[in-house]
From Swiss-Prot:
EC number: 1.5.1.5, 3.5.4.9
Binding site for NADP(+): 158-160, 183, 224
Name the UniProt record assigns to this protein: Bifunctional protein FolD
Coiled coil: none
Keyword Amino-acid biosynthesis among record annotations: yes
GN (gene name): folD
A GO MF label: methenyltetrahydrofolate cyclohydrolase activity
Source organism of the structure: Caldicellulosiruptor saccharolyticus (strain ATCC 43494 / DSM 8903 / Tp8T 6331)
Domain of life: Bacteria
HAMAP family, A to Z: THF_DHG_CYH
Reactions listed under catalytic activity: (6R)-5,10-methylene-5,6,7,8-tetrahydrofolate + NADP(+) = (6R)-5,10-methenyltetrahydrofolate + NADPH; (6R)-5,10-methenyltetrahydrofolate + H2O = (6R)-10-formyltetrahydrofolate + H(+)
Function text: Catalyzes the oxidation of 5,10-methylenetetrahydrofolate to 5,10-methenyltetrahydrofolate and then the hydrolysis of 5,10-methenyltetrahydrofolate to 10-formyltetrahydrofolate.
Amino acid sequence: MAQRIKEEVKSEIEKLKEKGIESTLAVVIVGNDPASRSYVNSKKRTCLELGINSVEYALDTTTTQEQLENLIEKLNQDPKINGILVQLPLPNGLDESRVCKKILPQKDVDGFHPMNVGMLATGIDFEYSIKPCTPFGVIELLKRENIEIKGKHAVVIGRSNIVGKPLALLLLRENATVTICHSYTRDLKDICKTADILVAAVGKPKFVTADMVKEGAVVIDVGINRDETTKKIVGDVDFETVRRVASYITPVPGGVGPMTVAMLMKNTLFATLLQNGLI
């Protein structure tokens, strides 16, 4: 699925190149967190594969808020830069929300700028907004798998600004009836059992078990956790037990993770089209 989306993006990038238009993503990484470095390398490899130019700005941990914001302003003003991605989390002492607000909305390929979030929430100029990659990827996955969303009860476990909230808004837009659950939700198991579509985005390994899932439900696992016993990467869903109950389930690794990277590339293409007046 993710590969198919990447091939579509590659084809569109090639068409732009025939018109003399290049697509360039600026990737900013602060510090030397191994997970962040791994994510950045993966994104750069994907850019190379699809014909998108990528420029990395690696800053050390002593970087100040002002220095980081000055770099973003420089990238905002550079007409050759179509997308700006600041790899999160940032080291302590740097304000992530200020950084997200500093990026021009039309270059905000993560979809975190308040203007993009506002367009998503209100539906005003929705078609011109850049959507957060993971929620966008979940919706795209459901649609391409021909899973009915309209009229279904979707339960999202997790209310983060990166996944839970925007995904709930996108599901609403697709005419699902949406329930958001979080750490203060009462009777969580009973609520989950009513879900036609259950999305786990809590960051707790194997949190969703088979007794929380309705027979035939669609289960989307957004979690990426390390199992402390086996040291393997696992999701928020106990895959082996839940797969026996669900009609459809996404694995971890795989599943949503590759879709997130594919949607980042799609967003970079979208930003390029937007800035060239092609949307």
